[in-house]
Swiss-Prot record:
Naturally occurring in which organism (per UniProt): Coxiella burnetii (strain Dugway 5J108-111)
Annotated function: F(1)F(0) ATP synthase produces ATP from ADP in the presence of a proton or sodium gradient. F-type ATPases consist of two structural domains, F(1) containing the extramembraneous catalytic core and F(0) containing the membrane proton channel, linked together by a central stalk and a peripheral stalk. During catalysis, ATP synthesis in the catalytic domain of F(1) is coupled via a rotary mechanism of the central stalk subunits to proton translocation.
Family to which the UniProt record says this protein belongs: Belongs to the ATPase delta chain family.
Pfam families: OSCP
Gene: atpH
NCBIfam families assigned: ATP_synt_delta, PRK05758.2-2
Protein's UniProt name: ATP synthase subunit delta
Subunit organization: F-type ATPases have 2 components, F(1) - the catalytic core - and F(0) - the membrane proton channel. F(1) has five subunits: alpha(3), beta(3), gamma(1), delta(1), epsilon(1). F(0) has three main subunits: a(1), b(2) and c(10-14). The alpha and beta chains form an alternating ring which encloses part of the gamma chain. F(1) is attached to F(0) by a central stalk formed by the gamma and epsilon chains, while a peripheral stalk is formed by the delta and b chains.
């Protein structure tokens, strides 16, 4: 995964720089998000690595799929997507498209001063609790916060909140682990 992110970074940065210059940041995000979903599809992935298909056939398949999923963004970026796909095909790097999407999203979040935070829970939180968590995180980090909700029954209760390197473990599992460590002394 780390290698894929390293390989993906220059591609994401190049697309981001182009998106900034041409005021097409959101269009590129939509395209990369769609490509990520396409590449994660097992049938599509099989076709991409199948030597029976030529590079041209693979490129046509991917372009047709992206055009179906994201017609507006594809229309805006048609020639750029075509060039981008050809570059990835030539370099045998199509399978890192999900990683390119991830790095691109991180670049866009940083540019827009947005922090992604994950809230891991056992029991679903109501809208009021989500809003309280979001407001507290926005106050703490002085930035807009996007919450990602993750269900994990192994926590037993409570929540774990992660934002970048910052972690707040308010789970029962975490409390029991800390108690056990303290008792061991």
């Amino acid at each position: 995964m780390a290698l894929h992110l390293t390989l993906a970074r220059p591609y994401a940065k190049a697309a981001f720089a182009d998106g900034q210059k041409a005021n097409q940041l959101e269009a590129w995000l939509a395209v990369f998000t769609a490509f990520s979903k396409i590449i994660k599809n097992k049938e599509v992935a099989r076709q991409i690595i199948n030597p029976k298909f030529s590079d041209k056939e693979i490129k046509t398949l991917l372009f047709d799929l992206i055009q179906t999923i994201e017609p507006e963004s594809t229309k805006q970026l048609k020639d750029k997507i075509d060039h981008f796909l050809q570059l990835l095909i030539d370099e045998k790097r199509l399978m890192i498209l999900p990683d390119i999407a991830l790095v691109y999203q991180q670049l866009l979040n940083k540019y827009q001063d947005i922090i992604e935070a994950s809230v891991t829970y056992v029991f679903p939180l109501n809208d009021e609790h989500r809003q309280q968590i979001q407001k507290q995180l926005e106050k703490r980090f002085n930035a807009e916060v996007k919450l990602k909700m993750i269900k994990d029954e192994s926590l037993l209760g409570g929540v774990i909140i992660r934002a970048g390197n910052w972690v707040m473990d308010g789970s029962i599992k975490g409390k029991l682990t800390r108690l056990a460590e303290n008792l061991k002394g």
